[in-house]
Amino acid sequence: MNPDEDTEWNDILRSKGILPEKEPDVDDVLDDALVDAKQLAHENRLENKDLDELAELEDEEDDEFLQMYRNKRMQEWKDQMSKAKFGSVYPISKPEYTAEVTDASKEVFVVVHMFQDSLPACKLLAAILERLAPMYPQIKFVKIPGKQAVENYPEAMMPTLLIYGHGDLQQQILTLATLGGMNTSVVDVAEALVRAGALKDSDIAALKDPQNAEDELGKRDSSVNDDLDDDFD
């Protein structure tokens, strides 16, 4: 009996531990590694493409692979939507902070806006977060007056943006100075969420499209101007 032969009897003996497992064929291992490497290269090339951009690549890519990758991206999107629980910016009070922020961040990322209504920068950030919340409903966005959250919290440190995840504070942003000041955009804040781990680069790819960025700028300016006008009514 040749223990290296691929026979049903040898397979039975191997399953019982009587014969050692057959050594993998070197050529087969190399072939598998090559296939994996090619697929990884394809996926890396396509990673940040949205569904419309994938459609534009149909002439360049293998149809079967492209359809498989499109299905994968669609499933990722569905999985993300299935995790959606929020979609708005929710007001919280100091007694609720531990449960609504620290404890909640063990399951999802939580973004906290500490604000003061009279500050234009706080109005700007509030308008941006109101845009982002429905776009990323898997993230919990909350707001709390700064002086309610921390007694005598200085105006000079507001707005403050706190990003929690995995049960702990991941990033703290004091004022809009590091984001762009009064020119801070939706993309600037979204990129901060990426740096904190709350989003992936691919999640904000559509936001970075020049046309989308222009649209968002118009919506942001309109919202902020409305808030500022209210102050003089």
Swiss-Prot record:
Belongs to the phosducin family. It comes from Schizosaccharomyces pombe (strain 972 / ATCC 24843) (Fission yeast). The lineage of its organism: Eukaryota, Fungi, Dikarya, Ascomycota, Taphrinomycotina. It holds the Pfam family Phosducin. PANTHER family: VIRAL IAP-ASSOCIATED FACTOR HOMOLOG. GO terms for biological process: protein folding. Residues 58-212 form the Phosducin domain. Residues 86-233 are annotated as: Thioredoxin fold. Keywords: Phosphoprotein. Residues 224-233 have a biased composition (Acidic residues). One of its GO terms (cellular component) is cytoplasm. This is Phosducin-like protein C2A9.09. InterPro entries: Phosducin-like_chap/apop_reg, Phosducin_thioredoxin-like_dom, Thioredoxin-like_sf. The keyword Phosphoprotein applies. The keyword Hydrolase does not apply. Residues 207-233 are annotated as: Disordered. Disulfide bonds: none annotated. The modification Phosphoserine is found at S222, S223.
